[in-house]
Structures are given as structure tokens and as C-alpha cells.
């Protein structure tokens, strides 16, 4: 660090000298203070990089677990659902259920693919107890893909999962107490199955709205927190610049 800054350091000097310390003039004290400030800033940058690494690793782990669970549930629901052959389902209902299940599985498998490809490389670096190994991790370059997997798994994937539950309730309950002969389905509210499916939809719609509102609120709170933290860092850098400018003017006077 001293070689890069071209500032000589006396190794016999104390770590935290005072400007009036015996054997060290004001010029040496200013140089030592400058080196300490730059070194502390370098360590803070490394700490920030490691925090980003651990955050990326946590997001990848959460995405992989969530995607594996929800995609597995969707596949089981598709395979295990038993359609009543004697009941004529509405065509839009079957098309919507098939499309929702396919998109749900595709989204979660894509998020799982990203997590599976990137997570081992991040884990390999995070398990090395060396501060300088942070540059070997691909989390900075792969940050857009990590955020994409996180969004697919926790936002879009969960919304599709809620829609999947609603459609599954309609397919499961709609034939209950319905007519067994072929023909158009009975009118709305005429049998128990239709009412049960309607109740599940009425319950799930507020849940979906609450989920969307919470997601937006959480994202805005997170952005506000990051903005405040960056503002504090900018203020600290500004104070450091003012202090260094004052030290340089003092050296010019001397």
C-alpha cells in the first residue's frame, strides 16, 4: 500500500502517533494518518464485497429450495389430478390449468438451473478463509442472473403457484353434485362443488393482493435502506476528502 501511494513509512514509528509526539513532526503524522484512512477504506471495500458474496449465496440457496419444492408440487398436482370422465369441464378451465402448470414448472426449473450452475462456484470461494479470494467469485459478473433467479422463484413463481391452487380447486370441486350425463355444466351457484370452488377463489384473491402489496413494500424498503447506506458512505468519503485537503494545505504552508 505504501509503495502504491509513494509515501515513506518509518517502521519504528508507533501505530497511532500524536502530532506532538516526541521524535515525529507534523508532516510525518499527517502521512501516517493518511495511510491509516486509506487502509481502513480498503478493508471496508473488501467487507462490502464479502457481504455481497454471502447475500448472493443466500439468494441462490433460497431460490433452489423454493423452486424445487413448488415445481415438484405442480408436477404431482398435474399427474395426480383425477378428471371426471362423465363431467364436461369448461374448455377455458382445462386450457388455463394446463398452461399455468407448464409455465409454473418452466419458471421454477429455469431458476433452479441458474442456482445449480452458479451456486457451486460461489460456495467454493466462500469456504476459503482468505480475504483476497473474493476476486475469484463470479457473483459480481453473474449478479443479473442471480437476481433473475431470485425474482422468478420468489415473485413470479409464487404468483403462478397461487393461480395453480385456484385452478386445481375448480377442477377438483366443480364436478361435485353436478349432473352425470353429458351436456353443458349447470348454472352458477346451482351445486355444492361450484360454491366450494368459488369460496377458494374468494379467499385466494385477497391473499394474492396482500402478497403483491407486501412484495412492493419490501422492495421499496430495501431500496430505501440501500440508498441511506450509500448516502452515509458518500458523506464519509466527503469528510475524508475535506480532511485530506486540509492536511495538504497544511503541508504546503509548512
Curated annotation (Swiss-Prot):
Activity control mechanisms: CRAC channels are regulated by fast Ca(2+)-dependent inactivation (FCDI), a mechanism that limits Ca(2+) influx and cell toxicity. ORAI2 channels display prominent FCDI. Inhibited by lanthanides such as Gd(3+) ions.
Could you tell me the superkingdom of the organism this chain comes from?
Answer: Eukaryota
What reaction is this protein's catalytic activity?
A: Ca(2+)(in) = Ca(2+)(out)
Q: Name one GO molecular function term.
A: store-operated calcium channel activity
Q: Which residues form the signal peptide?
A: none
> Mind listing the GO biological process terms from this record?
store-operated calcium entry
Q: Where in the cell is it found?
A: Cell membrane
Topology in membrane = Multi-pass membrane protein
Entry's transmembrane regions: 66-83, 94-114, 148-168, 196-216
Task: Site (Confers selective permeability to Ca(2+) ions): give the residues.
Answer: 80
Keywords, A to Z, come to: Calcium, Calcium channel, Calcium transport, Cell membrane, Ion channel, Ion transport, Membrane, Transmembrane, Transmembrane helix, Transport
Please give the GO cellular component terms listed in this UniProt entry. membrane; plasma membrane
Subunit text:
Oligomerizes in homomeric and heteromeric ORAI complexes. Native CRAC channels most likely consist of hexameric ORAI heteromers, implying that diverse ORAI1, ORAI2 and ORAI3 subunit combinations with distinct biophysical properties can operate in a cell-type specific way. Interacts with STIM1; this regulates channel activity. Interacts with CRACR2A/EFCAB4B.
Q: Which family does it belong to?
A: Belongs to the Orai family.
Q: Give the protein's biological function.
A: Pore-forming subunit of inward rectifying Ca(2+) release-activated Ca(2+) (CRAC) channels. Assembles with ORAI1 and ORAI3 to form hexameric CRAC channels that mediate Ca(2+) influx upon depletion of endoplasmic reticulum Ca(2+) store and channel activation by Ca(2+) sensor STIM1, a process known as store-operated Ca(2+) entry (SOCE). Various pore subunit combinations may account for distinct CRAC channel spatiotemporal and cell-type specific dynamics.
Per its record, how is this protein called by name? Protein orai-2
**Organism for this UniProt entry:** Homo sapiens (Human)
Amino acid at each position: 500500500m505504501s509503495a502504491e501511494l509513494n509515501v515513506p513509512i518509518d517502521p519504528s514509528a508507533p501505530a497511532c502517533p500524536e502530532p506532538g509526539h516526541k521524535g515525529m513532526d507534523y508532516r510525518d503524522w499527517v502521512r501516517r494518518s493518511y495511510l491509516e484512512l486509506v487502509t481502513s477504506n480498503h478493508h471496508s471495500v473488501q467487507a462490502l464485497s464479502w457481504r455481497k458474496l454471502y447475500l448472493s449465496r443466500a439468494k441462490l440457496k433460497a431460490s433452489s429450495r423454493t423452486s424445487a419444492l413448488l415445481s415438484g408440487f405442480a408436477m404431482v398436482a398435474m399427474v395426480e389430478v383425477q378428471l371426471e370422465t362423465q363431467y364436461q369441464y369448461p374448455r377455458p378451465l382445462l386450457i388455463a390449468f394446463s398452461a399455468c402448470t407448464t409455465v409454473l414448472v418452466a419458471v421454477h426449473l429455469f431458476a433452479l438451473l441458474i442456482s445449480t450452475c452458479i451456486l457451486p462456484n460461489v460456495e467454493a470461494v466462500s469456504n476459503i478463509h482468505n480475504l483476497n479470494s473474493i476476486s475469484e467469485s463470479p457473483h459480481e459478473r453473474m449478479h443479473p442472473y442471480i437476481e433473475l433467479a431470485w425474482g422468478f422463484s420468489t415473485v413470479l413463481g409464487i404468483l403462478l403457484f397461487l393461480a395453480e391452487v385456484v385452478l386445481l380447486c375448480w377442477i377438483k370441486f366443480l364436478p361435485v353434485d353436478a349432473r352425470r350425463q353429458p351436456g353443458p355444466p349447470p348454472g352458477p351457484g346451482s351445486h355444492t362443488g361450484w360454491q366450494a370452488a368459488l369460496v377458494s377463489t374468494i379467499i385466494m384473491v385477497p391473499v394474492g393482493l396482500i402478497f403483491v402489496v407486501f412484495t412492493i413494500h419490501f422492495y421499496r424498503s430495501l431500496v430505501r435502506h440501500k440508498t441511506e447506506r450509500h448516502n452515509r458512505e458518500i458523506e464519509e468519503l466527503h469528510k475524508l476528502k475535506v480532511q485530506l485537503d486540509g492536511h495538504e494545505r497544511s503541508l504546503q504552508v509548512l
